[in-house]
């Protein structure tokens, strides 16, 4: 367990730079898109710009021997007081896989525009240089940060 936490922290630190943040009072909903919007190979910056409207960092591998496995476009939005979707935006979710003998482990790295996003208030905050890293175990072991205008979440989906 401590190794997983350390791996999440190290990988997050490698990808993080600066962290401004902004709070949103409405409920956030995220939805993964259909299979037609999936990537079997790592997309380049131009493809991501065209597909989701921004250029998130998209490393081929992560610390600890995790390699790109797949990716898909996500859509997130807030719900207004009537339950109608507002503030729709696209994001990206990449799955990284590590294979050891007969065991396969995976982590997820997601990115979406940071505008109007808040980071978990239940998380432990770890300062790394100028970057605040938010570690949480609420849904899974996750590490979140904002770099420029992109919000990243690294999640251990094996929990």
Give names to the regions the model predicted.
Residues 1-26:
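Sec-dependent N-terminal signal peptides of Gram-positive bacterial secreted proteins and lipoproteins
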Residues 148-159:
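Surface-exposed amphipathic alpha-helical segments
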Residues 27-142, 146-147:
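Short, solvent-exposed recognition patches
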Residues 8-9, 103, 157:
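Intrinsically disordered, low-complexity segments enriched in polar/charged small residues
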């Amino acid at each position: 367990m401590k190794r997983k936490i350390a791996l999440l922290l190290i990988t997050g630190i490698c990808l993080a730079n600066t962290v401004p943040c902004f709070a949103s009072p409405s409920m956030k909903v995220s939805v993964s898109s259909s299979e037609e919007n999936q990537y079997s190979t790592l997309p380049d910056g131009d493809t991501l710009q065209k597909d989701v409207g921004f250029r998130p960092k998209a490393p081929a591998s992560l610390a600890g021997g995790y390699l790109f496995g797949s990716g898909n476009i996500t859509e997130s939005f807030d719900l207004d007081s009537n339950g109608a979707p507002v503030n729709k935006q696209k994001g990206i979710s990449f799955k990284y896989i590590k294979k050891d003998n007969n065991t396969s482990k995976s982590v997820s790295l997601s990115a979406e525009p940071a505008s109007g996003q808040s980071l978990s208030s239940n998380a432990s905050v770890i300062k790394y240089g100028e970057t605040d890293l938010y570690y949480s175990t609420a849904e899974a072991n996750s590490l979140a940060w904002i770099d420029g205008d992109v919000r990243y979440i690294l999640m251990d989906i094996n929990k």
